[in-house]
A protein has these predicted regions:
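N-terminal Sec-pathway targeting helices
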Residues: 1-4
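Catalytic glycan-binding domains that act on GlcNAc-containing polysaccharides
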Residues: 7-171
Length: 171
């Protein structure tokens, strides 16, 4: 019995190594400010950069949340940020979380649509929702035509469920 309890406790600690909550001071701050679930933010960071603040994608997205130059310019104007350093963890998390907040409002809290839009663009998601080929009801997607976005959405949702399991249900 004691061995079972020890194994369960240790297993949860081991899982936390693979699902970290690094940069928690910034994630907590901007999660609260922009009303975005902190475990969604961690899931995006894990998927996008594996918590590497210097990560750069082949498409030129940068930092922890893989912010594109276009999004960084838009966010810096909206948030009145001068001298943007996209590799600065706080700035990157602030911009990424602000963008998730915008997507949350646009897609009325639908996680799958938010995540798909974060990767594939909100314009594409709106277009797919209008197409009977990709949506039965105009509110959700039956399929995502971009393979990368489809795989990305599944991966972020899987990571999100795991973060919830580890940090919410295993307390």
């Amino acid at each position: 019995m004691l061995l079972t309890v020890v194994l369960c406790v240790n297993y949860n600690q081991i899982e936390k190594i693979f699902y970290p909550t690094e940069y928690s001071e910034y994630v907590e701050k901007y999660s609260n400010e922009y009303k975005v679930d902190k475990y969604l933010i961690y899931s995006i960071i894990k998927t996008e950069s594996k918590f590497d603040p210097d990560a750069v994608s082949p498409k030129g997205a940068s930092g922890l949340m893989q912010i594109t130059e276009k999004t960084a310019l838009w966010a810096s104007k909206e948030l009145n940020i001068k001298d943007v350093d996209i590799y600065d963890p706080e700035t990157n998390i602030r911009m990424g979380t602000w963008y998730l907040h915008r997507l949350n409002k646009e897609f009325k809290g639908d996680l799958s649509l938010m995540i798909s839009a974060y990767n594939g663009g909100s314009g594409n998601v709106r277009k797919w929702l209008k197409s009977s080929e990709y949506s039965d009801d105009g509110k959700s997607l039956t399929q995502i035509p971009f393979k990368e976005t489809s795989q990305y959405t599944e991966k972020v949702l899987k990571n999100y469920r795991k973060y919830i399991e580890i940090y919410v249900y295993s307390k």
